[in-house]
Amino acid sequence: MAKTRVLLVGESWVSSATHYKGFDQFGSVTFHLGAEPLVKALEGSDFELDYLPAHEAVDKLPFTMEGLSVYDVIILSDIGANSLLLHPDVWLHGKTVPNRLKLLRDWTNAGGGLIMIGGYFSFQGIDGKARWHRTPVEETLPVTCLPYDDRLEIPEGFRPTITGSKQHPIFAGIEGEWPVLLGANEVIVKDRADVEVLAALPEEHGGHPLLVAGQFGRGRTVAWTSDIGPHWLPNTFVEWPGYARLWKNVLSWASKAV
């Protein structure tokens, strides 16, 4: 049986630090991968995951429907819209290239499964710099992005509230209390018959949507407004047996396997 092809786009960054030691100082640069918990959770599963880090996605995310069509599900996680709009040919040389946000919309409309996972450069993101608001990708999502910084920082933590039917395929095999999360992106649920809010923040934290499922054309879309790893999603959540089950269920649903 063929595996479900999944493309994860984003979840990488480079940090630069200056270390001061009395009179002296030196610099260091560190490369980070943020999707390792998900990569590990899918090892040996029915899903074949290709991981396209943010810096590679700028010029390697396909520019054609044919290139995207090899995948059943595409995940956008912690990567801003500019990374897919400002290809070097555009940014450095003033040339035209296909608009990959429109391609992702059309690919989803034709039957693909599109997922956006939260983070500092997801939805609208920190300082509003993720910039997915009013884009073709936002058209596909079951939620609308805010036009400004949308972060919900909750250092005391919160436990998700299940708001949808526990019989939904995304909840299959997940039992008991969910672990604590530390933040999410604030979004607005679209008022459509196909959209279902499956989980939310507790009312004391605003009751904002956490897990939302919907349809776009012949495709399916999912918004998970928290992260897939630290810091918003702590290691206690990663180590929870429901973590791997949740993401396998989400991918199965988005790919229309269930």
For each feature predicted by the language model, list its residue ranges.
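An acidic, glycine-rich "communication" segment
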Residues: M1-A2, V14-Y20, A35, G113-H205
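Alpha-helical scaffolding within the catalytic cores
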Residues: D59-M65, K102, G206-L210
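Short alpha-beta junction capping motif
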Residues: K3-V9, W13, G67-I126, Q215-W224
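Short, flexible/disordered intra-domain loops and linkers
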Residues: A17-T30, L84-T96, G125-R131, T236-E239
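Extracellular ligand-binding/catalytic regions of CAZymes and related secreted enzymes
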Residues: M1-V9, G113, D194-E196, E203-H208, ...
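Short, flexible loop segments at the rims of nucleotide/cofactor-binding pockets, characterized by
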Residues: D50-A54, V90-G94, A199-A200
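Aromatic-Pro/Gly-enriched surface loop or interdomain linker
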Residues: M1-S77, I117-Q124, G214, N235, ...
